Amino acid sequence: MEFLKIESILDTADNNRAFLSNPDIARLVLSKFDEMETKYRWRFPFIVIMPNHVHCLCCDSDNALVSLGKVLGEIKGSTAFQANRILGKEGKFWAAENFDHWCRSPLKVESVKRYIMNNPVKARLVSKPEDWPWRKPK
């Protein structure tokens, strides 16, 4: 239930911290996820970059090279540095914490996928998921 409260706050937050709505930063973050797939053999088949947070479905494989924490740490570290340069600012960019949820069945994976892809609609940013530009798959 705590997650739903946080999600509601994020979806209705003002735009003072909506740095991910900058197209250059959104592209940067999507590109970093792609890089991590190649580099560490984790898969991120569904990603949505919201104005102030990111949703992704991540799948490890039997040959993933590092932990998910390591992958997310690298994504957050390198994109924070580059995003701050784009914005001309310094300091903290991402929240320190991540929220994760293990999907233990194909049904749950499908539910999480739908949730992720529909998040821009739920936040009233677009009327259809496919209209949101900062997502994977397109």
What is the predicted role of each segment?
Residues 1-138:
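Short catalytic/metal-binding and nucleic-acid-binding patches
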